[in-house]
Amino acid sequence: MSALHLYNSLSRQKEPFHPITPNHVMMYVCGMTVYDFCHIGHARVMVVFDTIARHLRASGYQLTYVRNITDIDDKIIRRAAENNEPIQALTQRFINAMHEDEAALGCLPPSIEPKATEYVAEMIAMIGELIAQNHAYIADNGDVYYSVRSFDEYGKLANRRLEDLRAGERIAINEAKNDPLDFVLWKKAKTGEPSWESPWGAGRPGWHIECSVMSRHQLGDHFDIHGGGMDLKFPHHECEIAQSEPVCGGKHVNYWLHNGFINIDNEKMSKSLGNFFTVRDVLKNYAGEVIRFFMLQSHYRGPVNYSDAALEEAKRGLQRLYTALETAPTTGGAILLPYQERFVAAMDDDFNTPQAIAVLFELAKMLNKAAAAEAADIAFTLRTLAARLGLLTGDAKTLFQQKGALSAAEIEAEIARRQAAKAAKDYATADSIREKLSALGIELKDSATGTQWYYR
């Protein structure tokens, strides 16, 4: 196995990766709450952990990748009521949309995708364990709360003391709680809302307990990697630790991974600021692979600044890689080990995709200048390494075709007209056709065997 190092949010440093079971990695990632279309922040979570999953598999590990679906939540209940739509119909509609979005981004499905509503019985059982251990209590209002004072290490993931958390957080006053930071495990049923019977009366689970239960059920009391967006680090993941460690017998996750935020033109993405984009919004103007490439150009832990200019730059970069392969051999070839080793070293260094992509550009530059005898090995290496990032697997002519632009057949017809004009020595017409295509972002490359075209 490789010398993989991960940045562990819990220790706040890079650590060598050692799976609990040799050659087998167990990874849980917090998924979507399905009440709306996925936004580009969700897209980053999808792309980041899909890329991590791809690298783990390519490194020889068997991977069990679990990503949950939250299909019961206050937001879901509220949206279903607003739409006058059954909750299950609403959630299934947005689950289907989520799957379409991740497929467009080139993401492979997780190994297991549990839904919260499928594990309510297990949630009730775990809450019962926490009550029995005096980590939770039944409040006067019928809710069940977790007592943060019962867990001495609460705040260790956020690296903040309990007193500091109380002082720094804006917490709504709730007289039913023993402590303002206590969080709900079970919500007493309200009229018109879904509910399940429990020893504490009818109700439904809180958000935090859902992930503790689903990860435990699928991966056991102790697993390798838990991931999600930086916004989940506190309180969600902090609360998961507090819930899981008492019932799992100690440390339940070895490595905590968090991806950074997406900003819009250097401002935080927010519906109130009017700079909120769904994946579908962006896919209207850019291919999914362009969005994926854009996100992988930044290290997963850092912020990404989304703008049209940045997407256009990413598109041009991806086109350069595809263009290098345009006339390269599509069969044969052997891996160039020095480039593979550098690529793998970058990915083993906490999934450093910017450095890995730099290796791809070096190969593309070599390929543009390569003699025929060398081209097959370079092209094979470029395609093989790019595929580990989920890149360069599509058809460039389809990928970069502008909305409303000429189809491939129409471009070929224009090239044929140009060839006929050149044969008739009508060079003015031939030049005019080339200029027309160039204005549409289509470049022509003439050779002894004919004319190739590609998007600039």
From Swiss-Prot:
Monomer. InterPro entries: Cys-tRNA-ligase (IPR015803), Cys-tRNA-synt_Ia_DALR (IPR015273), Cys-tRNA/MSH_ligase (IPR024909), CysS_C (IPR056411), Rossmann-like_a/b/a_fold (IPR014729), tRNA-synt_1_cat_dom (IPR032678), tRNAsynth_Ia_anticodon-bd (IPR009080). A motif ('KMSKS' region) lies at residues 268-272. It catalyses: tRNA(Cys) + L-cysteine + ATP = L-cysteinyl-tRNA(Cys) + AMP + diphosphate. The keyword Membrane does not apply. GO terms for molecular function: ATP binding; cysteine-tRNA ligase activity; zinc ion binding. The gene is cysS. It is found in: Cytoplasm. It comes from Dichelobacter nodosus (strain VCS1703A). Zn(2+) binds at C30, C211, H236, E240. Keywords: Aminoacyl-tRNA synthetase, ATP-binding, Cytoplasm, Ligase, Metal-binding, Nucleotide-binding, Protein biosynthesis, Zinc. Pfam families: CysS_C (PF23493), DALR_2 (PF09190), tRNA-synt_1e (PF01406). This is Cysteine--tRNA ligase. SMART domains: DALR_2. A motif ('HIGH' region) lies at residues 32-42. The keyword Metal-binding applies. SUPFAM superfamilies: Anticodon-binding domain of a subclass of class I aminoacyl-tRNA synthetases, Nucleotidylyl transferase. GO terms for biological process: cysteinyl-tRNA aminoacylation. Its cofactor is Zn(2+).
